[in-house]
């Protein structure tokens, strides 16, 4: 038996793992306008198009400033990447329309950002603190869960 077939071998119990069946649905490609928050704009797209959940397929653009949270030995910290013109290198994660009204369904988007000095930073995008600089183009794909 390997670690994949024996969930307890890596210290995770079944209460920490959730498996679900589903399929991909519609694709939305959108332009996020200057000074719109990236996380909030993606959640609003889900709401506008009636998508409960979506995965990020691609994000291209830059931010006024970047703010990422990350876990450290002494808890969660935040890092501010000074702009303007912080480049988005990669964004991945799941967007949840319910996150706009329900904190129990948080959107979790991780990103790699490049500062104006070329340094690269990674972490979770902080809601309300990552504003589009000029524009951001984003592609989301709906995830539809299947009933058990």
Q: Where are the language model's segments positioned?
A:
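N-terminal intrinsically disordered, cationic/polar leader segments
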Residues: 2-57, 64-148
């Amino acid at each position: 038996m390997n670690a994949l077939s024996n969930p307890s071998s890596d210290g995770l119990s079944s209460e920490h793992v959730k498996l679900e069946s589903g399929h991909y649905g519609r694709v939305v490609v959108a332009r996020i306008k200057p000074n719109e928050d990236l996380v909030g704009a993606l959640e609003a797209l889900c709401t506008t198009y009636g998508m409960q959940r979506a995965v990020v397929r691609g994000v291209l653009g830059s931010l006024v400033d970047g703010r990422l949270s990350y876990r450290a030995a002494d808890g969660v910290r935040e890092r501010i990447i000074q702009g303007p013109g912080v480049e988005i290198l990669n964004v991945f994660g799941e967007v949840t329309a319910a996150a706009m009204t329900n904190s129990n369904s948080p959107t979790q988007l991780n990103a790699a950002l490049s500062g104006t000095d070329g340094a690269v930073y990674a972490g979770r995008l902080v809601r309300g603190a990552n504003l589009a600089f000029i524009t951001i183009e984003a592609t989301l794909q709906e995830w539809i869960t299947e009933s058990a």
